[in-house]
Amino acid sequence: MDIITIIIGIVGIAAGFAIAKIIEKSNISNLIKNAKKEAASILKDANLEAENIKKDKILQAKERFIELKSEHEQVILARDKKVAEVEKRVRDKESQVSNELSKAKKVNDEFEAKTAEYNNKIEVLDKKQAEVDKLHKSQLQQLEVISGLSAEEAKEQLVEGLKAEAKTKAMSHIQETIEEAKLTAQQEAKKIIINTIQRVGTEEAVENCVSVFNIESDDVKGRIIGREGRNIRALEAATGVEIIVDDTPEAIILSCFDPVRREIARLSLHKLVTDGRIHPARIEEVVAKTAKQIDDEIIEVGKRTVIDLGIHGLHPELIKVVGRMKYRSSYGQNLLQHSREVSKLCGIMAAELGLNVKLAKRAGLLHDIGKVPDTESDLPHALLGMQWAEKYGEKDEVCNAIGAHHDEIEMKSLLSPIVQVCDAISGARPGARRQVLDSYIQRLKDLEDVAYGFSGVKNAYAIQAGRELRVIVESEKVSDDNAANLSFEISQKIQTEMTYPGQVKVTVIRETRAVNIAK
């Protein structure tokens, strides 16, 4: 039973295997057929796709060909158009050249005709000239026979007579012209000067050496004086101004010949009284700040002055010098007002004479800058001012006008006499100057300069109208013993070299300070 079952199983397996093989062969055959069909279909599609691509490419190639053909035709048309234009221009040019040649030929023919006519006329004139010369020679011979003189002798007599007559008439005419010119020149000069003076209106300016500082009450005087006078001494030492506190109600008098120092003292007092803190350290601080403020104001005054007068391109140092003129005087006349007046006069006079107005005003404004520097110089102020002008690049005409307005050097331009005349007009006005005041101020300056001539002197201030000279020395260079000797030497030099009324008290002040800063 088992064997039969096994045999049947084996036969079944064999039969199944055979059947599987048959089925597998059948499937493979079907797959091959399907693959062939699919391959045929793909090949057919590929052929169709290739045909379509081929048609598209052919179509694109045709379109590109048409496009290139169109562009080529346009290029050819443009080129043909340009060629046609060039040919037209060439034809026009040829026509123009032909016309020009025709005109030139016509002109040449006319020129040749006129030349021939001219030559004929020259021949006729030559014949007539020969006849005239022959006739002239014949008449000249007849005149020589009649007059008994040769032609040369007759010419000489005629020329001499004409010379004498012409000389007489010329001398008479020259004399009349000179007299008329003198009369006219005097009249015109007077007219110009009168018109110039009438067109400038200025105030009478008289400087003094005293300023009055008004206070609200007399109680302020005690605070200004300070304990044992230390505040007033510190203020006088810092400013170089004599401060007079007397019985004048609600007023303190500031006395100093230098207007800059006096103004610094006045402004410093105003700040101290307004602030209320008055002591030596505060006084020195306020005076230093006020001096800086005055320097800034000087520059501002200089700028405003040159702008008002229409002067441009002035060196900053010269602008500062112009500003310092506000605090200088000449024979009692404020130097800035005087220089402004001279500048305006020069401008008006230059306009009347047809000269450079701006250059004339510039020279007029700067003509007295030699009076401004604080340092003493042996040169006259006109030459010193000329040196300053040359140093800061002013033109030669301006420099010469500055240096020659008091005849120290030769005048080399027309501006120089104008500046000289206008300076004289400004200074010669009635009430314009007071020579006594100027000589007084010069005496005080000379007094201070005597002290500055000694070694170790830091500051020197002439006060009490020149009756006292306060000298502040450097403690490192001058000892206490030397201070007394220095006072004696200064007094002896003043007595020897200067002329002064009364007596001059020389006070030498030596102060030692030790300063440290706590940080």
Curated annotation (Swiss-Prot):
GO molecular function, one term: RNA binding
One cellular-component annotation, GO: plasma membrane
Membrane topology field: Single-pass membrane protein
Sequence intervals crossing the membrane: 3-23
Entry superkingdom: Bacteria
Segments forming domain KH: 209-275
Main location class: membrane
Name of this chain's protein: Ribonuclease Y
Organism from which the protein derives: Flavobacterium johnsoniae (strain ATCC 17061 / DSM 2064 / JCM 8514 / BCRC 14874 / CCUG 350202 / NBRC 14942 / NCIMB 11054 / UW101) (Cytophaga johnsonae)
Lineage summary: Bacteria, Pseudomonadati, Bacteroidota, Flavobacteriia, Flavobacteriales
